[in-house]
């Protein structure tokens, strides 16, 4: 889909036009650049959750500020984004921010398989342990690769697994900011499974698996949950937290 969209844009835009990819994951810009090298591809990041509650009805359920890679052509547009209520956080290097966001997005698969709204899922200790294991595995790989993910939430990246493994009452107390989520908010992957659409598992867990391969390491927990999402069918039933922990061996 990324390559096809990039090709369509290349046919409609003048050569050299800057285009920001706001998709989840890390490699989308590389895919777009290969498909449409005549355009200037830049990184972007959407920090908040957007759920499709009904056809044409998109619901923003969490807070955050759009982040983009700096480009001289963007400067004149910044006041317009501010006026529209969509201020941009501009970064010379967005890659650490994207990895910081990807760490949070590792929960998307857990949320999708749970069948629950995000807040309800995060209040379940078993589901939190699953997400903590996915993040811990990824943090290890990032350290091996010399990549330092940026802080894009209330907690530092390295603290996320410890925070998620806290007992329920303590988690509610310590993670109050994390739990400021609209009751209707779900992950985009949950929307995809509900509508039997192709998910973005390859752009999230897939990035972790590719990083592991580059580092000659394994990422078994991310591989297992990726397998679960890929094998999902319209007849599949949501997994309880205990069942998911057992499958992931965490």
Task: Indicate residue ranges for each PLM-predicted region.
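Short phosphate-engaging motifs
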Residues: 1-2, 28, 73, 109, ...
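Short active-site oxyanion
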Residues: 15-19, 63-66, 214
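Glycine-rich beta-alpha junction loops
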Residues: 26, 45-50, 72, 94-98, ...
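NAD(P)-dependent Rossmann-like dehydrogenase/reductase catalytic/cofactor-binding core
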Residues: 82, 132, 136-250
């Amino acid at each position: 889909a990324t390559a096809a969209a990039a090709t369509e844009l290349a046919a409609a835009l003048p050569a050299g036009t800057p285009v920001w990819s706001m998709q989840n994951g890390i490699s989308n810009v590389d895919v777009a650049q290969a498909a449409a090298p005549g355009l200037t591809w830049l990184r972007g990041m959407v920090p908040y959750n957007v759920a499709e509650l009904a056809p044409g009805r998109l619901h923003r359920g969490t807070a955050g500020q759009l982040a983009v890679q700096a480009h001289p052509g963007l400067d004149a547009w910044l006041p317009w984004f501010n006026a529209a209520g969509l201020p941009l956080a501009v970064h010379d290097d967005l890659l650490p921010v994207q990895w910081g966001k990807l760490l949070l997005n590792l929960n998307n698969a857990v949320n999708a398989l749970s069948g629950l709204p995000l807040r309800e899922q995060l209040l379940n200790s078993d589901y939190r342990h699953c997400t903590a294991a996915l993040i811990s595995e990824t943090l290890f790989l990032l350290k091996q690769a010399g990549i330092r993910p940026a802080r894009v939430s209330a907690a530092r990246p390295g603290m996320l697994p410890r925070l998620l493994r806290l007992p329920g009452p303590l988690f509610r107390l310590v993670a109050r900011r994390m739990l400021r989520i609209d009751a209707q908010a779900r992950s985009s992957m949950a929307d995809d499974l509900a509508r039997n659409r192709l998910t973005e598992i390859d752009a999230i867990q897939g990035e972790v698996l590719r990083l592991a391969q580059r580092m000659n390491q394994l990422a078994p927990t991310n591989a297992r949950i990726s397998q679960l999402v890929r094998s999902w069918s319209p007849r599949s039933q949501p997994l309880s937290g205990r069942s998911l922990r057992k499958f992931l061996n965490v």
